[in-house]
Curated annotation (Swiss-Prot):
The lineage of its organism: Bacteria, Pseudomonadati, Pseudomonadota, Gammaproteobacteria, Enterobacterales. Signal peptide: none annotated. It is found in: Cell inner membrane. Belongs to the DedD family. Keywords: Cell cycle, Cell division, Cell inner membrane, Cell membrane, Membrane, Transmembrane, Transmembrane helix. Residues 100-109 have a biased composition (Pro residues). NCBIfam families: PRK11633.1. One of its GO terms (molecular function) is peptidoglycan binding. This is Cell division protein DedD. The gene is dedD.
Length: 220
């Protein structure tokens, strides 16, 4: 073990010594190479190395007073080739580029509302005037009446009485105010002429739909 360690130590020392000897020489060689390159490139070019500019004519050289032949013809030809500016054409071109005004929409007319028809209330029907039946005084002597019928329907009694009175007959009921469900007699008269009452039985039947009987009148 000791011999191996010693061998390694000796080898390491030899390598370090070689590095110390060889590295300075390498570094000096590189420095010299860089110095040679700097020396090869001159900082300021020599006078003979610069390219001399072409010989320019002197500023004081006199220019020709007359243009060369053919120059005037070329100028005139160029003027003729140039298009002439017509004032009308210029004005037309200017008008072409003027922006067109935006179309203005006409105002929409307001819808006219039709007048609402006035709804007139229908006139109330006028009640027909009932014919005035003259109340004849009951005869003082013997009198007669026509009994048309006896009904329990109070509405039907009132309907028949209205028709007969509208035709001009003298009509009354017993009892005087019809009561629903109770018997009510319909009587026409009284009249002193029995024959007259008998002659009216046909018309009374047409108006009321009832067959009447002539009988003696007894005042209540």
């Amino acid at each position: 073990m000791a011999s191996k360690f010693q061998n390694r130590l000796v080898g390491t020392i030899v390598l370090v010594a070689l590095g110390v000897i060889v590295l300075p020489g390498l570094l000096d060689g590189q420095k010299k190479h860089y110095q040679d390159e700097f020396a090869a490139i001159p900082l300021v070019p020599k006078a003979g190395d610069r390219d001399e500019p072409d010989m320019m004519p002197a500023a004081t050289q006199a220019l020709p007073t007359q243009p060369p032949e053919g120059a005037a013809e070329e100028v005139r030809a160029g003027d003729a080739a140039a298009p002439s500016l017509d004032p009308a054409t210029i004005a037309a071109n200017n008008t072409e580029f003027e922006p067109e005004p935006a179309p203005v929409a006409p105002p929409k007319p307001k819808p006219v509302e039709p007048p609402k028809p006035k709804v007139e209330a229908p006139p109330a029907p006028k009640p027909e005037p009932k014919p005035v039946v003259e109340e004849k005084a009951a005869p003082t002597g013997k009198a007669y009446v026509v009994q048309l019928g006896a009904l329990k329907n109070a509405d039907k009694v009132n309907e028949i009485v209205g028709k007969l009175r509208g035709a001009g007959y003298r009509v009354y009921t017993s009892p005087s105010t019809p009561v629903q469900g109770k018997i009510t007699r319909i009587l026409v008269g009284p009249d002193a002429s029995k024959d007259k009452l008998k002659g009216s039985l046909g018309e009374l039947k047409q108006l009321s739909g009832l067959s009447g009987v002539v009988m003696g009148y007894t005042p209540n």
